[in-house]
Amino acid sequence: GEYTAIAIANPGGMMMEGSESLSTQMSSPRRVTVSGADVTGVELALEPLAAISGTVTSEPAPASALKDACKNPPRFYKEEIVIDARGEAKSKPEDEVLRMLNAFTRTTPNDQSEFTIGFLRPGVYRPEAQLPGENLFVKSMTLPPAAPSEKRIDAAKTGVRLKAGERVKGLILTIGEGAAGLKGRVVTGEEDKPPSEKTRVYLIPAEPDAADTVLRYFEADVTVDGAFSLGNIPPGSYWLVSREVTASDQDDAARNPLAWDAGGRLGLRFEGEATKKLIELAACQRLTNYVLKYSPLIKPSKASKKPPQ
């Protein structure tokens, strides 16, 4: 049969989450085929794992919003935020093993709002945050600039490239208050039925200066009854579009969010602008029962095998 071999060395004798696993070493996974006999000579080269460390800050909703929908916002604690780093998706069979180890990268800030995401193999990662309330959104995540005179680096846009054993420090994760939410359904045809094919919705920032703000892009799968839900959205102007999901894009673990790619963002904005329908989301607004009309792409018919007359 087919097997995946991987070696893990931890001086403490146990794998722990976050910063506790900074001294762990791991090999790249190797595919091994066993055909009725012992397999020898499999080499697994250990290399030190990398880490990203930083702090969490927060910004309250604007004073004007506190008088209306954001009045008396619920209190939250930074220690409740779950922080992770998502690597670029790969579809190799051996990467299934690495995905099972992702639980060890998750961490939470300490009482000083500091965190360390450990247990990371070489590659490009984008930090992510699971927020403890619908009133919150990720406003920015930045790294120190290469030179003091330059601006901080947008880690959500560029990702964080890690080498074996590298320790990247200084990530600032800023949490904003006053997030909006959007729920609705996608319908097709004259009878407003749910799409017959698997569909995904994309929320796209409409402001020109937000074209490359990756944290302003959202996507969600549409359920079989046509429903969708998007939350923790920064207030602003948006377009909403839907697309049929191709077979290669149905596995969330084996694909990247479309907004990670500059070309993906450009395509979404082109499609969104063509709708000429803006959605204005105010601070703390909960827009429900939104109906998005979707026109499925017409699949081309097969070419005739008969020669032209």
Regions flagged by a language model, labelled:
Residues 1-309:
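Long luminal/extracellular ectodomains of secretory-pathway precursor proteins
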